[in-house]
Amino acid sequence: MTATAQRQRPIDTTGAGQRAQQAELHPELNRAHVRFINLGKTYHGKQGPVEALGNIDLAVQHGEIFGIIGRSGAGKSSLIRTINRLEQPSNGRVLIDQVDIGEFDEDKLVELRRRIGMIFQHFNLMSAKNVWQNVELPLKVAGVPREQRARKVAQLLELVGLQDKHKAYPAQLSGGQKQRVGIARALVHDPAILLCDEATSALDPETTQSILGLLREINQRLGLTIVLITHEMAVIRDICHRVVVLEQGRIVEQGPVWQVFGDPQHEVSKTLLAPLQTGLPKEWAERLSDQPQRPDAALLLDVHFTGVSAEGPDLAALFTALGGKVELLQGGVERIQDRAIGHLILSVAGSPHSRDELLARARTLAPRAEVLGYVG
């Protein structure tokens, strides 16, 4: 998955001297589109302060699709809403194109929010207005002339594939079509950044794939930076370039999607990604023991391949190295960002090698291999 180099006009409301000073202090800002520096957010309630975010230090690059995942209450929504200042941080800074948006007055915030589109889980369409009117409304509010509005709405409806639905009302649309209207409306001011807050969680799997395809096309054609939060790990796998994992308002893991999904390091990441993993079949798990019960007992190995060549892991070499009778009980290989990610559960019986030797041989060909136990 490759983000295009085409870029939108950067948000620029401060002087060159300040930007130069920021770039000198933080060289990585020359590349980052959105930068969080030591960001924190604390809510104050009747039972005292609750820290939603703490010590967030993170960069989102121009033109990438960046995913944020975490359990409920991890701080995902709080983080994404600091980008357009719907949430005011308690401490730290958010920079967009090297500009500290915490220093913006109300007029500059209005301009900022026009340059940052946002789509939501529940579409937020006006039921009394048709598709055309829903998309046109932000332009009308901004005082854009009628002819210019008409051209823009027509272009956007064609982009999202709804040019034949322009007179339809929300009640006449499917969930996917409503979200396409929401996406078109979010793009009316030619944003440089698009925020997606659980944008597919109310959709069925087929419609979800359709919306992801549209977001991918928008990213590639317009060069948009897309930041999304979701509880659907498959969405991150299918569309994002990089991902960050939050837990209790802290970053616990981040990296390219193929790396985090292929070999998660933190327990929270492993838990979140568990539904995508293949486990030991129940009939084998019930017979598993730490020690062999018979001379012909089979040793079970849990083997992971992460980011190997596009052709995939060399299973023939692995089976030969293990020796004996090798069976694939569960698993498979998928491709994420043009890299092969594999998870295999193998049964090895009659091998001339000891348990430790088998494990060592497996680890010469796979980044991660563990002994599950014996069957038989």
UniProtKB/Swiss-Prot annotation:
PROSITE patterns: ABC_TRANSPORTER_1, ABC_TRANSPORTER_2, METN
Reaction(s) catalysed (UniProt annotation): L-methionine(out) + ATP + H2O = L-methionine(in) + ADP + phosphate + H(+); D-methionine(out) + ATP + H2O = D-methionine(in) + ADP + phosphate + H(+)
EC number: 7.4.2.11
Subcellular locations according to the entry: Cell inner membrane
Cellular component aspect of the GO annotation: plasma membrane
Pfam families: ABC_tran, NIL
Keywords: Amino-acid transport, ATP-binding, Cell inner membrane, Cell membrane, Membrane, Nucleotide-binding, Translocase, Transport
Top EC class for this record: translocase
Family: Belongs to the ABC transporter superfamily. Methionine importer (TC 3.A.1.24) family.
Quaternary organization: The complex is composed of two ATP-binding proteins (MetN), two transmembrane proteins (MetI) and a solute-binding protein (MetQ).
Role description: Part of the ABC transporter complex MetNIQ involved in methionine import. Responsible for energy coupling to the transport system.
Protein name (record): Methionine import ATP-binding protein MetN 2
Source organism (scientific name): Pseudomonas syringae pv. syringae (strain B728a)
Lineage: Bacteria, Pseudomonadati, Pseudomonadota, Gammaproteobacteria, Pseudomonadales
Gene this chain is encoded by: metN2
